[in-house]
């Protein structure tokens, strides 16, 4: 903008000074400025500029102090405030200065008079002069002349050569037969260029064989030059007008045949046609001789938009082609499709007897579709049962649920307004059912931003069994399979690689499968790949931490699809103790889309941990996700509990197997009985046995059969142990009593453990036979199970009435107080004392005998003897 303003200012200044100089007005009344040798000089020449004051002009107060200043104004010098550049000064009435190295173009020099040394009064202009620097014109070259159409005029153009920087006049002269002469002029300067002139004359076809000569002459102040003569004929310069009114007709609505028609000048004998589909970059060229405005085209594509253009020529071998006509754009009619659809499918089991079949197919290309595809006809057929499912859809996919049994085939055809294509058939097999057909060593490598190179090795099964390979890929993003359908390529069986580029975008992870198909089987291998990757933007979000069976289960949500930035290889779970500065521990998990939880078993119970997760791609690790705190509660170690319990049990059993420790323990426990606890001693008068049999005065007759009954019965209270106390300790054998019917009482053996001592007030030697048979004693009744029986007795049993008192340990004789302490063996007394220690944990002093009101049966009133038993038995 600033440069434009400066150029405009300089132009105005030049114009103003030029007008002043040309008009010879008051600006030059003080003097004159001249230039020698001329105002126009060639490049590299010098010029002398003289500035002279007129008589009686100059500084009136100080005539001797006339200072003449020469200023230079050029287009390429920045002149502030239009003051110019000072190139010379001189004191006097005249001054001459030689200028050199002037640039091409016009340069203005102005002479000024300065009468004061003060800066307040500016110098006064005296006069100025222009000096133009340029070059002589070069001879014009490359002259060509044309006449557009039969009724056009002749126009010629040429190359002027180098710019002269001066005003240069050009003259075009034409001469021909019959003294034909014509010329035109134009000039070139800094504002316009002259390199073409229209002579304004028309050459008729009558002069077709005549020759014409043209010449161009250039003249300026530094010289002149002329071009070489240029000779031509009518056919050489006349160019037909472009054809017009172009149209096309299709024969019988055919999409491949059409007749192109146009209008042309009458003298045209040759036409050139070119046409192409709009999406093409190359033209189909056709030459038509004497076409008379019509030509048949037979190789057009149906339902394709074409562009047509035509050019004309007046002579088969000479002359020039006309310009191309305006374009005609039109679409050819439809025809029935000729292509075969490329079909693929996916299987998914729904339950034990149903499966979902999803069919996919690629659209036909325009050359195969040959029209607008209106719909697709889909057929799914079960071979053995002849079950057929048909449907019509406008989409390129179709899904149907069918039984899992039977062999199925699918076919798809495309239809437009003219017809349908041949159906494409495919057998529905288990694509990944045969492991022997699975390709090996499948790899996916990024080639650039838009494609992925997939390579593999042939399956274990013979290569001849593989009919073709299918490379299938699908973006691993949320959405239905119809919204994001798979893409696939068919690869010949001898190729082991494929470059996939269809719908491949950077920073998106794709699941890639390589299928090897035979006639009736299939095997597949899969891998994930991307064309470009970065570290994920964020980490997985931990949603829950649960504790089960001494393990923590970490649950998370996957990273949103746009933030994954490629294929995720691993998830990492980090944990460390809260407020710990140590490096965290980690667990790396192989990424699987279906997995959203993982167990950890290395955390200590009752310790608070901080956990977080990250994701890893081939480019790096993501930032950490959210942090979660968790304190495992742990679980009691049942193994340690069982082992410790067994050890305690063994120690306890071993300790209580020793009699001394067992007695001490029982004694300690018996002291712990509370005073409110009293063990009730049952009264024999209330027993079932007494109620069943009447009480006699001296004895009770018992049938011996009744002795075989279980005693005591379940209804009776728990039997108590009764200690027998005698004045003289007599060993008595104690064992379970059992006697059979008809055998009476048998002898029994005596053991040390069962020995007791009987207190007898009489001397042993003074006992009579009856007395010895009826020893009055109290038998010690031990606690038995209800199933216990009486053992055989070898001596008669006699019970004599004796006064007694209830005790805590059993029934004692009434004369126990008469027992002398020295008559009892201390050792035996100790053994007797500890044989019947109570197992109660309460103090024995708290026991009280049960007191009944009224008359009751006591042992003093009972007398039982062997004779009575035998008599009852009889």
Swiss-Prot record:
Consequence of changing residue 778 to F: No loss of IL12-induced STAT4 activation nor T-cell proliferation. No effect on IFN-gamma production
Phosphotyrosine: modified positions: 757, 804, 811
All residue ranges annotated as the Fibronectin type-III domain in the record: 139-237, 242-335, 336-430, 438-530, 536-635
Keywords: Disulfide bond, Glycoprotein, Membrane, Phosphoprotein, Receptor, Repeat, Signal, Transmembrane, Transmembrane helix
Residue interval(s) of motif WSXWS motif: 321-325
Quaternary structure annotation from Swiss-Prot or TrEMBL: Heterodimer/heterooligomer; disulfide-linked. The functional high affinity IL12 receptor is composed of I12RB1 and IL12RB2. Il12RB2 binds JAK2 (via its N-terminal) through a membrane-proximal region of the cytoplasmic domain.
Origin: domain of life: Eukaryota
Organism: Mus musculus
Extracellular topological domain: 24-637
Gene3D superfamilies: Immunoglobulins
GO molecular function: coreceptor activity; cytokine receptor activity; protein kinase binding
Keyword Nucleotide-binding in annotation: no
Compartments, as annotated in UniProt: Membrane
Gene Ontology CC terms: external side of plasma membrane; plasma membrane
Descriptive protein name: Interleukin-12 receptor subunit beta-2
Entry-linked Pfam families: fn3, Lep_receptor_Ig
């Amino acid at each position: 903008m600033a440069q434009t303003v400066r150029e405009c200012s300089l132009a105005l200044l030049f114009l103003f000074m030029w007008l002043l100089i040309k008009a010879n007005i008051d600006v030059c009344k003080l003097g004159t400025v001249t230039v020698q040798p001329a105002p126009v000089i060639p490049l590299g020449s010098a010029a002398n500029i003289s500035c002279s004051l007129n008589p009686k002009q100059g500084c009136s107060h100080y005539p001797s102090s006339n200072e003449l200043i020469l200023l230079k104004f050029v287009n390429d010098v920045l002149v502030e405030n239009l003051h110019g550049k000072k190139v010379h000064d001189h004191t006097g009435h005249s001054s001459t200065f030689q200028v050199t190295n002037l640039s091409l173009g016009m340069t203005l020099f102005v002479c000024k008079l300065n009468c004061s040394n003060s800066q307040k009064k500016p110098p006064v202009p005296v006069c100025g002069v222009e000096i133009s620097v340029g070059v002589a014109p070069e001879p014009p070259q490359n002259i060509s002349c044309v006449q557009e159409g039969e009724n056009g005029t002749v126009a010629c153009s040429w190359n002027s050569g180098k710019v002269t920087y001066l005003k240069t006049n050009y003259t075009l002269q034409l001469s021909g037969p019959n003294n034909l002469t014509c010329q035109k002029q134009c000039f070139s300067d800094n504002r316009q260029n002259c390199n073409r002139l229209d002579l304004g004359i028309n050459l008729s076809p009558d002069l077709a064989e005549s020759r014409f000569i043209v010449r161009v002459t250039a003249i300026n102040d530094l010289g002149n030059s002329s071009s070489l003569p240029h000779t031509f004929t009518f056919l050489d310069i006349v160019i037909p007008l472009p054809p017009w009114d172009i149209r096309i007709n299709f024969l019988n609505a055919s999409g491949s045949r059409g007749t192109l028609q146009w209008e042309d000048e009458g003298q045209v004998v040759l036409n050139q046609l070119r046409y192409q589909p709009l999406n093409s970059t190359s033209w189909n060229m056709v030459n038509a001789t004497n076409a008379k405005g019509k030509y048949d085209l037979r190789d057009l594509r149906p339902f394709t938009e074409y562009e047509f253009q035509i050019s004309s020529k007046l002579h088969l071998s000479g002359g020039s082609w006309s310009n191309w006509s305006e374009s005609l754009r039109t679409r050819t009619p439809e025809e029935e499709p000729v292509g075969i659809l490329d079909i693929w499918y996916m299987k998914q089991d729904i339950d034990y007897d149903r499966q979902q079949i999803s069919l996919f197919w690629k659209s036909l290309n325009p050359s195969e579709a040959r029209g607008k595809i209106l719909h697709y006809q889909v057929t799914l057929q079960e071979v053995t049962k002849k079950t057929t499912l048909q449907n019509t859809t406008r989409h390129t996919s179709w899904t149907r649920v069918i039984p899992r049994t039977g062999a199925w085939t699918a076919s798809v055809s495309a239809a437009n307004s003219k017809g349908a294509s041949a159906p494409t058939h495919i057998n529905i097999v288990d694509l990944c059912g045969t492991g022997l057909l699975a390709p090996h060593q499948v790899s996916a490598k990024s080639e650039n931003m838009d494609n992925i190179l997939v390579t593999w090795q042939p399956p274990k099964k013979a290569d001849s069994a593989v009919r073709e390979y299918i490379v299938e890929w699908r973006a691993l993003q949320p959405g239905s399979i119809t919204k994001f359908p798979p893409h696939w390529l068919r690869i010949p069986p001898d190729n082991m690689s494929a470059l996939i580029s269809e719908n491949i975008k950077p920073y998106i992870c794709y699941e890639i499968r390589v299928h090897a198909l035979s006639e009736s089987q299939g095997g597949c291998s899969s891998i994930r790949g991307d064309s470009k990757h970065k570290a994920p933007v964020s980490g997985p979000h931990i949603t829950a931490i649960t504790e089960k069976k001494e393990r923590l289960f970490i649950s998370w949500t996957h990273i949103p699809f746009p933030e994954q930035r490629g294929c995720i290889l691993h998830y990492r779970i980090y944990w460390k103790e809260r407020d710990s500065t140590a490096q965290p521990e980690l667990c790396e998990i192989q990424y699987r889309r279906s997995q959203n939880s993982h167990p950890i078993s290395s955390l200590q119970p009752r310790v608070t941990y901080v956990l977080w997760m990250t994701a890893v791609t081939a480019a790096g690790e993501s930032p950490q996700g959210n942090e979660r705190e968790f304190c495992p509660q742990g679980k009691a170690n049942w193994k340690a509990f069982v082992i410790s319990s067994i050890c305690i049990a063994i120690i306890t059993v071993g300790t209580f197997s020793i009699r001394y420790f067992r007695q001490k323990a029982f004694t300690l426990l018996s002291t712990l009985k509370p005073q409110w606890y009293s063990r009730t001693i049952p009264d024999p008068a209330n027993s079932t046995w007494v109620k069943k049999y009447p009480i006699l005065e001296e004895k009770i007759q018992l049938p011996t059969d009744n002795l075989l009954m279980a005693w005591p019965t379940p209804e009776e209270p728990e039997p108590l142990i009764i200690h027998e106390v005698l004045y003289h300790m007599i060993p008595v054998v104690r064992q379970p009593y059992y006697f059979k019917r008809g055998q009476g009482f048998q002898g029994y053996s005596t053991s040390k453990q069962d020995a007791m001592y009987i207190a007898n007030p009489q001397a042993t030697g003074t006992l009579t036979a009856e007395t010895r048979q009826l020893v009055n004693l109290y038998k010690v009744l031990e606690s038995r199970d209800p199933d216990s029986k009486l053992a055989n007795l070898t001596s008669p049993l006699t019970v004599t009435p004796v006064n007694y008192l209830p005790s805590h340990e059993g029934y004692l004789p009434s004369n126990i107080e008469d027992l002398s302490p020295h008559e009892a063996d201390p050792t035996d007394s100790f053994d007797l004392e500890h044989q019947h220690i109570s197992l109660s944990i309460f103090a024995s002093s708290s026991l009280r005998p049960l007191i009944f009101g009224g008359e009751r049966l006591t042992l003093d009133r009972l007398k039982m003897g062997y004779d009575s038993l035998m008599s009852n038995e009889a």
